[in-house]
From Swiss-Prot:
Keywords: Acetylation, Amidation, Neuropeptide, Secreted. The modification N-acetylalanine is found at residue 1. GO terms for cellular component: extracellular region. GO terms for biological process: neuropeptide signaling pathway. It comes from Rhodnius prolixus. This is FMRFamide-related protein 1.
Amino acid sequence: AKDNFLRF
């Protein structure tokens, strides 16, 4: 997933 920063 490129939205890895959303993996809180």
